[in-house]
Curated annotation (Swiss-Prot):
Cofactor(s) for this UniProt protein: Mg(2+)
InterPro entries linked: NDK-like_dom, NDK-like_dom_sf, Nucleoside_diP_kinase
Species of origin: Teredinibacter turnerae (strain ATCC 39867 / T7901)
Single GO biological process annotation from the record: UTP biosynthetic process
Gene this chain is encoded by: ndk
Protein name per UniProt: Nucleoside diphosphate kinase
Binding site for ATP: K11, F59, R87, T93, R104, N114
EC number of the protein: 2.7.4.6
SUPFAM superfamilies: Nucleoside diphosphate kinase, NDK
Record carries keyword Nuclease: no
Pfam families linked to this entry: NDK (PF00334)
């Protein structure tokens, strides 16, 4: 099995609900290590740049507005098959379709306010991690 890194964001609605510890506990119980983390308030440019691939989609403006509506917690997770494992822990993008016990089923408010972001591939993970973290900020253990 491959040791991978993936990016995770606890979105503004989950930060506001004060469920960061619950979410972190799920990462760790699944065997993922948190090797970098920062809380920040994204501005329009930073959020828009991160979600650049969605710029032409009709939901882009709403997505940027939501992601800038409050602080987010951004972390790098590391472990065996971290990308797929994190996506499994998160659950389906639409919380109505998410399995019981997943982060989105338990903490999302809607499709657009779905509590967490996770990289969808190792390529995306590398790009997304570099967007928010310098190599010196990541501490593999």
């Amino acid at each position: 099995m491959a040791i991978e890194k993936t990016l995770s964001i606890v979105k503004p609605n989950a930060v506001k609900k004060n469920v960061i510890g619950d979410i972190y506990s799920r990462f760790e119980k699944a065997g993922l290590k948190i090797v970098a983390a920062k809380m920040t308030q994204l501005d329009d440019d930073r959020a828009g740049g991160f979600y650049e691939e969605h710029k032409a989609r009709p939901f882009f403006g709403e997505l940027v507005e939501f992601m800038t509506s409050g602080p987010v917690l951004i972390q790098v997770l590391e472990g065996e098959n971290a990308v797929a494992l994190n996506r499994e822990i998160m659950g389906a993008t639409n919380p109505e379709n998410a399995a019981e016990g997943t982060i989105r089923k338990d903490f999302a408010d809607s499709l657009s306010e779905n509590a967490v972001h996770g990289s969808d591939s190792t390529e995306s993970a590398a790009r997304e991690i570099a967007y928010f973290f310098d190599a010196a900020e990541i501490f593999s253990r």
